[in-house]
Amino acid sequence: MQVGVLAVQGAFAEMAAYWRAQGADTFEIRQLADLERDIDLLTFPGGESTVQGKLLHDLGLFKPLKDRIQGGLPVFAVCAGLILLAEKVEDAGGRPGVRPSQWFGVLPVTVRRNAYGRQLGSFRTVGTFDGKPDVPMTFIRAPAITDVLAPDVEVLSTFDGAPTAVRWRNITAFTWHPELNT
């Protein structure tokens, strides 16, 4: 399996290592030419969603990536990646956040940035993921999914009653960092 790891900012090295440990071949996506390779799975790492969104626009990657996602390319997104994909984004106070043009808007959920607090609010816990109990979950400045906007969005895990991982069509997205729990 060929996994393209978005590598413009954030924890892309950890994401690539995670997929290599699963037996995948990985390569970094940093420029438009990188999208010419065969990609079986596109991954969005954790990091700073505002910076990632700006860089994707500046590098000319935003529209080609959005077209591939909307065309059905499988996507695995973590934390900042979830924020970039969400249909609606709120700031930590629940007010509309980042400009809509800065995110993809392809995943029918509402997310709240930094919902569990800033860096000092980061934590580890265990939970059930996709029916598997006792799965370690690491939350780092994590967003929260505050609303699921389509009936066919599958909730894969929850924390304190809020969805923390979802699957919709070709997109699987996490508020927590599965790549840090292997």
Where are these regions (language model features)?
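Redox-cofactor binding/interface segments in oxidoreductases and associated redox assembly factors
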Residues: 43-44, 77, 174
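N-terminal beta1-alpha1 cap of cysteine-dependent amidohydrolase-like domains
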Residues: 1-71
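Residues that mark the start of a beta-strand
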Residues: 1-4, 103, 170
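Amide-donor transfer/coupling interface in amidating biosynthetic enzymes
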Residues: 113-182
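General beta-strand structural signal in soluble alpha/beta enzymes
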Residues: 28, 77-78, 166
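Cysteine-nucleophile active-site neighborhood
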Residues: 49-127
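A secondary-structure boundary/capping signal
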Residues: 8, 78-80, 107, 141, ...
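Hydrophobic anchor at the start of a short beta-strand
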Residues: 26-27, 75, 171
